[in-house]
C-alpha cells in the first residue's frame, strides 16, 4: 500500500492542523496508510487546542517528495501556499473551502470544495457519509477549527452548516461551545509573548493578476498590543517584500471583540488596497471597518481590484 501524507498550507492555522489530523483519522479508519504532517510552526491558538484535547501535533516537514509520491491537501489548493516540492508529487485528494487558483493536475483526483466557513465542516460530512465514528479528541479538534475560522460564528464566512456542525461536534467533544470558544480565541489572541515574526506568522501568498501579494492576519483583543510594535512589524514586512519580491504585503490586525481591523500595508501596490476599500493609508496604516475575514473580505476584493 502506498503511503500518503496529508497537510494544510504553509504558516498553518488551527483549521489546517486539525483538518489534516481529522482527514488522516478518517482515512486510517478506511484502511489507508496515511500520516498528517505540517509545513510550519504551530501558533499559540493551535497549541492551546492540541493541549486541551491531548492531541499530538503533526510532524514538521520541509519537503514531501523525499518521503512519498502521493499527497492529500486540506484547507488549501494554491501551489504557492503548499509544500515547496508539491510539483514533484501526485495530489490524489483535496478538501478545501477556499477559491481555486494556480492549481491543476495531470490525473483525476478526489476534489471536494464547499463554500462553508471551515474545512472540518466538510470533513464532518465525510465521516458521516462513510459511517466512521468520530472520537472525542478528533471532535474537539474539528470543533476548534470551526470556532477559529468563523471567529465563534461572528465571521461573514460562517454558514448555517458550520453552526450545525459545531453543535454536533460539541456534543461528542463534551464541551460548551461559548465557554470553550472564548477561552480558545483569547488564548490565540494573547500576543504579549509573541516575537515580531510570530505576529506575522499567519500569512498567505497570492497571485493577483500577475502581482505577488502576501496577506498576513492576526486576531487580538486590543490592536494597540500590535500597533505599539509597529516599527518592528513594518521593518520585517519591508524585509519580506524585498526578499520575496512582493508587490504588496498587507497585514490585517483584527479585533475579535469589535469585529473591525486595522491594516498595515507595505509595497508598491498599496494604492490598490486604497482603491478597493475607499481608504487612505497614513504612515502605512488605515482602518478596515467591519473586515474580519481574509478569505471573504480581503482576497476577493483585492483580486477584483487588481484585475481592473
UniProtKB/Swiss-Prot annotation:
What UniProt keywords are attached to this protein's entry?
A: Cytoplasm, Hydrolase, Manganese, Metal-binding
This entry's comment on the bound cofactor is: Binds 2 manganese ions per subunit.
Q: Which InterPro entries match?
A: DDH_dom (IPR001667), DHH_sf (IPR038763), DHHA2 (IPR004097), DHHA2_dom_sf (IPR038222), Mn-dep_inorganic_PyrPase (IPR022934)
Q: Which GO terms describe its cellular component?
A: cytoplasm
Chief location: cytoplasm
Reaction catalyzed = diphosphate + H2O = 2 phosphate + H(+)
Top enzyme class: hydrolase
Q: Which Pfam families match?
A: DHH, DHHA2
* Residues annotated to bind Mn(2+) 2: 15, 75, 97, 149
| Sequence positions that bind Mn(2+) 1 | 9, 13, 75
This entry's Enzyme Commission designation comes to 3.6.1.1
Any coiled-coil regions, as ranges: none
Q: Where in the cell is it found?
A: Cytoplasm
Its cofactor is: Mn(2+)
GO MF terms held by the record: inorganic diphosphate phosphatase activity; manganese ion binding
Q: Which NCBIfam families match?
A: PRK05427.1
What family name appears in the similarity comment? Answer: Belongs to the PPase class C family.
Q: What is this protein called?
A: Probable manganese-dependent inorganic pyrophosphatase
Amino acid at each position: 500500500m502506498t503511503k500518503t501524507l496529508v497537510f494544510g498550507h504553509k504558516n498553518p492555522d488551527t483549521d489546517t492542523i486539525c483538518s489534516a489530523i481529522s482527514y488522516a483519522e478518517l482515512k486510517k479508519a478506511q484502511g489507508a496508510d496515511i500520516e498528517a504532517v505540517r509545513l510550519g510552526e504551530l501558533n499559540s491558538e493551535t497549541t492551546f487546542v492540541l493541549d486541551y484535547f491531548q492531541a499530538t501535533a503533526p510532524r514538521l516537514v520541509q519537503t514531501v517528495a523525499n518521503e512519498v509520491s502521493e499527497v492529500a491537501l486540506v484547507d488549501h489548493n494554491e501551489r504557492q501556499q503548499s509544500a515547496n516540492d508539491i510539483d514533484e508529487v501526485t495530489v490524489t485528494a483535496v478538501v478545501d473551502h477556499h477559491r481555486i487558483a494556480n492549481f491543476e493536475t495531470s490525473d483525476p483526483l478526489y476534489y471536494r470544495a464547499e463554500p462553508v466557513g471551515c474545512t472540518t465542516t466538510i470533513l464532518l460530512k465525510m465521516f458521516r457519509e462513510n459511517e466512521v465514528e468520530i472520537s472525542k479528541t478528533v471532535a474537539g479538534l474539528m470543533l476548534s477549527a470551526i470556532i477559529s475560522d468563523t471567529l465563534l460564528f461572528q465571521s461573514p464566512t460562517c454558514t448555517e452548516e458550520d453552526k450545525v456542525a459545531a453543535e454536533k461536534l460539541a456534543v461528542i467533544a463534551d464541551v460548551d461551545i461559548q465557554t470553550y470558544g472564548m477561552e480558545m480565541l483569547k488564548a490565540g489572541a494573547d500576543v504579549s509573548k509573541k516575537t515580531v515574526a510570530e505576529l506575522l506568522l499567519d500569512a498567505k501568498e497570492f497571485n493577483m493578476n500577475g502581482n505577488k501579494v502576501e496577506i498576513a492576519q492576526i486576531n487580538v483583543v486590543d490592536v494597540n498590543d500590535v500597533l505599539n510594535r509597529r516599527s518592528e512589524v513594518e521593518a520585517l514586512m519591508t524585509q519580506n517584500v524585498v526578499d520575496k519580491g512582493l508587490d504588496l504585503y498587507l497585514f490585517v490586525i483584527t479585533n475579535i471583540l469589535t469585529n473591525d481591523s486595522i491594516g498595515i500595508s507595505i509595497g508598491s501596490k498599496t494604492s490598490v488596497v486604497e482603491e478597493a476599500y475607499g481608504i487612505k493609508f497614513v504612515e502605512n496604516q488605515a482602518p478596515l471597518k467591519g473586515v474580519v475575514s481574509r478569505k471573504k473580505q480581503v482576497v476577493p476584493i483585492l483580486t477584483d481590484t487588481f484585475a481592473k
